[in-house]
């Protein structure tokens, strides 16, 4: 159990290789035809081509990555970030291939990738959360207004699968609610394939608090904490 297949490229792959080297692990770097000859590949113990330049045919090609792991004898798969790093189907496929993904399980990815499910899990664990709806919103203007009044304006409407500022809209007053719901619902369906929406209290002057937890399957966990003032980008991505 000493070989890691790196399912990523460039600086990300380089950082993983350096970490593996410090831990005494052998590295296999998967690469697309477009990255053949790239300098970062020289640091890998082995490099293997997984397909043509388009990401769908290489870095997002699950069967090709699993085949690369089998051919090279890798026992671990590190997806880095981006590409397949938050893809629950990839995590499931890696587990079914009797390999170890360096990352969350498919179950956790599905849960935390849906903001409503993630918030429900946090509430169940006793984590303080921003006031909001208990689940997705009904397509009922009267019910929406009651919820918004209970929470208190301004509120923010958000898509459970949204991100990057898309699929969310701030509602300052009751007369804006119906139109904002319709637009956010349409955006969510268009960009994320799911028109579900949930509601939270909008924070006018938030602080961006980032919490990272590193844990293994045996229950050993380390908490890393970083708190800093919200940037414009973070304000546009209230979660």
Language model features with spans:
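N-terminal beta-alpha lobe that positions the nucleotide/phosphoryl donor
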Residues: 1-239
